[in-house]
Amino acid sequence: MEFLTKITQQLGLVGEIDKVGSVFVLGEEYRPYIFKTQGKADDAETAFGSFLGNAQTNPQLLSDIETRIFFTYRTQFTPIPRDEEGPSPINLTLFFRDNPINTLENVLTDPDSFYSDIGWGCMIRTGQSLLANAIQRVKQTREFRVNLENIDIKEMSIIQWFQDDWKYPLSLHNFVKVEGKKSGMKPGQWFGPSSTARSIQSLINDFPDCGIDRCLISPQSADIYEDEMIRVFEENKRANVLLLFATRLGVNEINSIYWSDIFQILKSSYSVGIAGGKPSSSLYFFGYQNDYLFYLDPHQTQSSSLDMDDNSYYRSCHGHRFSKIHISETDPSMLLGMLISGKAEWDLFKDEFKNSRIIQFVASKPSDDIYEGVDLSPGSVSVHSIQSDLQDTGDYIDVGNFMSEKANSSQPSKNEEFENVKCKNQRILICENPSETEIEQVLVEDSTTDN
């Protein structure tokens, strides 16, 4: 059995890990392969080792990856009632991704409730994965390694907090609930990075037993307001602070100027991962090798945790099966997670990222918000007016809409130059000729909030 497990692991990973180049997993560095030259092995294992060129994936690397907690689509969970103005729980995707009998039963017995998050919950699942690994680090340290043959009681309690039912504090159900209250998000609507960050912040604030003392979010940038961090550590110099940055690092793809900064984040010991990936298809990134990002995919469908015994549920939240994607193919919208434990780490963190092109340290929150004093509560007249002018694609403004009338202009495109402008409240001045000007206001939230 042990040998078969090794075969499964090796065949699953040999195509993902290159033999050249260190692998970085949330601050840990590994040689990708080790070469067996000593010790005895049976004939089958020897033959398999020859098939791999006597190379064996580094077991310490595998153990670290296996220890990462991750969550996926689930079916037949506690129902989430549909909002009258929200999307329908019934869609064709369910018939292909779920058991058709389950789907048909739900349609016939309760067509106005969601029994699965297939097709809309992947950003929540990757946000849960990021949060779970942050909590795991607080509760069990970075050195903890999972043993799937023997459930760790402390880690099991962490995983149970995420089960799909209203009574569990970090469930998908409660992600939907708190964001619905904050922004009017409806069940079945796809979350963006900012929505996920706000949900995590609210859930942490309501659940101090998770071990994270404060969660500071930057909904549309990676700015850290130092005065806020100072206040946190004045109250508790050992505070565990989760920083969440919902940011966009390009137009259709990550601008190559930021590649090294993304690698620096995943290489950092403060990183708890990145949620993002592709438009409307979020992944959980936990490491990289060369120019490839390693990720866990939430789009595999599993049964409800409530229908599993503890052993099965525990194993379903771990595993070696991961994939990789070249950084140039990833979507620029993402949620970055960093965990700072105590004032001493904060000082080291600032020094480590002082030259980052993504993470920016700002003395205090600026007060020149172009919408300061405007009612931005869900459903307000002001919000309706703004939304009618702006197309929100996953929490981010598509600046291309503002430029659409200029697309056929003979003037050369300046989009690449605009990508590197580091301004939050922008007034874009468009000049086709000296006699015609047009000014557009673009709202980009930059506040680091702690509500």
UniProtKB/Swiss-Prot annotation:
One of its GO terms (molecular function) is cysteine-type endopeptidase activity. Its main location: cytoplasm. It holds the Pfam family Peptidase_C54. The active site is at 122 (nucleophile), 297, 299. It catalyses: [protein]-C-terminal L-amino acid-glycyl-phosphatidylethanolamide + H2O = [protein]-C-terminal L-amino acid-glycine + a 1,2-diacyl-sn-glycero-3-phosphoethanolamine. The keyword Transport applies. Its EC number is 3.4.22.-. This is Cysteine protease ATG4.
